[in-house]
UniProtKB/Swiss-Prot annotation:
Leader sequence residues: 1-18
UniProt-recorded name of the protein: Solute carrier family 35 member F6
Subunit structure: Interacts with SLC25A5.
Principal subcellular localization: mitochondrion
Protein purpose: Involved in the maintenance of mitochondrial membrane potential in pancreatic ductal adenocarcinoma (PDAC) cells. Promotes pancreatic ductal adenocarcinoma (PDAC) cell growth. May play a role as a nucleotide-sugar transporter.
PANTHER family per record: PTHR13146, SOLUTE CARRIER FAMILY 35 MEMBER F6
Length: 372
């Protein structure tokens, strides 16, 4: 069945905005500008400020939800299904997981390449699968277990590619290892978030845009408040800002004022996450969850291609092998092998059936009344 223009638009929107989301965050990290008080030029290393911006983008999904709801009231058929009452605080635990996992990933993105960052995020299926078995009493198919094992192998190969690659002054080997481990740690937290959402949230038939928006609201408010104590927590040289504190939000705003392109990168990150969530949910509804997974894989390829073209990282053949193994594991876990096996089975049966028909016709060439 051919895709409609609207479906093609949604798929393209998801691919483009998903790629912009990671690339804009990495672009902001690459900027160098003066900070507050005439401090020397330094890199824009403000992961928690970036995380606040991302949650602001998620929070804006609430606006999209209410727009759809208002549009549905004007029309006879609403795209927003009626819901049963629910307690908004149900979203607090998954929002805290989202806030923690996202903040860790933004810290990690300062330490490793954008392509490795995107590839290692595939580890989420390992922990989601294990937690689903442990807490949701779900039984995984043998192909899903195999997909998890293959994904682990892919993560090992991607990690080896980072270890064996040459590192510049911006990304030292110790930083890359720490960054990769932080990404894996963040996927454990994101997997807990997914299990919590499935166990406590989705049974209330809540619209996904509303769910993302409420989680974005909690994340934005809580993390914005946490920026105050972070301004005073010393972390020595780990933070990368002149004051050596966990997060210096004032320094971030000063750098944005002195280098306006940082504001453009942050705006790209905020707006892209909103459109990415909307298009991802719409792709699942209009097409399928499998299509969404395939587009997410294509997003990794786009990010990788752009970072290579822009000179942000160097090409390493071992990374291709790791990506292909990860792709195979993800495909198996999500059941992408089933349509392929069904297609091959049909192709195999067709020649066999044609051969049987030829044999039957060949055997029946002599009329029955002449057989005696």
């Amino acid at each position: 069945m051919a895709w409609t223009k609207y479906q093609l638009f949604l798929a393209g929107l998801m691919l483009v905005t998903g790629s912009i989301n990671t690339l804009s965050a990495k672009w902001a990290d690459n900027f160098v500008a003066e900070g507050c008080g005439g401090s020397q030029e330094h890199s824009f290393k403000h992961p928690f400020v970036q995380a606040v911006g991302m949650f602001l983008g998620e929070f804006s999904c609430l606006a999209a939800f209410y727009l759809l709801k208002c549009q549905g009231r004007r029309q006879s058929a609403s795209s927003v299904e009626p819901q049963q009452p629910f307690n908004t605080l149900l979203f607090l635990p998954p929002a805290l997981c989202d806030m923690t996992g996202t903040s860790i990933m933004y810290v990690a993105l300062n330490m490793t390449s954008a392509s490795s960052f995107q590839m290692l995020r595939g580890a989420v299926i390992i922990f989601t699968g294990l937690f689903s078995v442990a807490f949701l009493d779900r039984r995984l198919a043998p192909s899903q277990w195999l997909g998890i094992l293959i994904t682990i192998a892919g993560l090992v190969v991607v990690g080896l590619a980072d270890l064996l690659s040459k590192h510049d002054s911006q990304h030292k080997l110790s930083e890359v290892i720490t960054g990769d481990l932080l990404i894996i740690m963040a996927q454990i937290i994101i997997a807990i978030q997914m299990v919590l959402e499935e166990k406590f949230v989705y049974k209330h038939n809540i619209h996904p845009l509303q769910a993302v928006g409420i989680e974005g609201f909690f994340g934005f408010v809580i993390l914005s408040l946490l920026l105050v104590p972070m301004f005073y927590i010393p972390t020595a040289s780990f933070s990368g800002n002149p004051r050596g504190v966990l997060e210096d939000a004032l320094d971030a705003f000063c750098q944005v004022g002195r280098q306006p392109l940082i504001a453009l990168a942050l705006l790209g990150n905020i707006s892209s996450i909103a459109f990415f969530n909307f298009s991802g949910i719409s792709v699942t509804k209009e097409l399928s969850a499998t299509t969404r997974m395939v587009l997410d894989t294509l997003r990794t390829i786009v990010i990788w291609a752009f970072t290579l073209a822009l000179g942000w990282e160097i090409f390493y053949p071992l990374q291709i092998l790791g990506f292909l193994i990860l792709l195979m594991g993800t495909a198996l876990y999500n059941g992408l092998h089933r349509p392929l096996l069904a297609f091959l089975s049909r192709r195999w049966r067709l020649p066999t059936q044609e051969g049987e028909q030829e044999r039957l016709l060949g055997d029946s060439r002599t009329p029955i009344n002449e057989a005696s």
